[in-house]
Amino acid sequence: MGWGGQEIRILTEARGFLDRGHRVVLYATPGSRIAAEAPGYGVPLVTLPIGRKRPAGVAALARALKAARHDVVNTHSSTDSWLAAVAVRMLRDPPVLVRTRHVSVPVPNDPGTRWLYRKATARVVTTGEALRLQLVRDNGLDPARVESIPTGIDASAYAALPQDEARRLVGLPLDVPIVGIVATLRSWKGHRHLVDSLTKVSTPHTMLAIVGDGPQREVLERHVDAQGLVGRVRFAGQQRDVAPWLGALDVFALPSTANEGVPQALLQAMFAGVPCVTTAAGAIPEIARDGETALVVPPADPAALASAIDRLLADRALGTRLASAARAYVTPRFGLATMLDRMDKAFRRAIEDAKR
């Protein structure tokens, strides 16, 4: 498991349930990034050999679950879902399984996967309605057992910060337009298209801030160099607190091409009041409505992306209107407390269903 919105949600959700008085344990692979980050969130951690689908991992997880006597096991990826599904069948009084699915990559329809989703798992939670509909339509899941619970954002962490102050905090210049992205550096997040769009943006001296790290970093750095943009692109790396980076931006861009639920970073930007440019990948349209809460462009289209960025940089009133509408839309629907309330209900429904 790497590090991105999925892992941040896992730890934030765990911390939230701990604060509400629940007993929570994170099971993770030794040496994994999420295991390293868990203490910073105050989340109890048990490391197990569960990085691969192997009998040793099943046995270790079964022993841990037997000792802990949990009510619910919430899995988040293919590997942990398979290991947990087998492990609980080794227990006399097993916990129920709830699977959270974070991406819109198609789920296979082979017999094993059908068993995992339809029989072994009590409930499935998705991070966007588009993902829920996909599982019902393409995989035949019972609609009553699948629900969309997008990631919740702590609004207090994204209170408006004066732009000049934010730029001083993160070391960005005060006198140039700055476009930014917060995302793990994966190919489908669209970083390359955003870099290419910078060569087409007509607003003078526009800079790009790339916040995040990941497998595409070296590739992107070479591409930035090849495009002659080294002086105009800032690679900020992974940042625990992205609020000042968002506060420093004139425009937030997330040009994803695939796989998205409701992206956590796009929600953060909207809570922070930053005008947004994005695409209609995955469940993004659930919060990004073109001309209402964001500007939405076709995926993999640097020219369209550049045009939208120029439009927001030139028309600050438009940016203010979109940002205000976006914040008004997401605040009552995508807050942290809302997510925790809905996940609590999902877990309780799973437990009740298992008793029938």
What are these regions (language model features)?
Residues 1-356:
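Membrane-interface segments of envelope glycosyltransferases acting on lipid-linked substrates or membrane lipids
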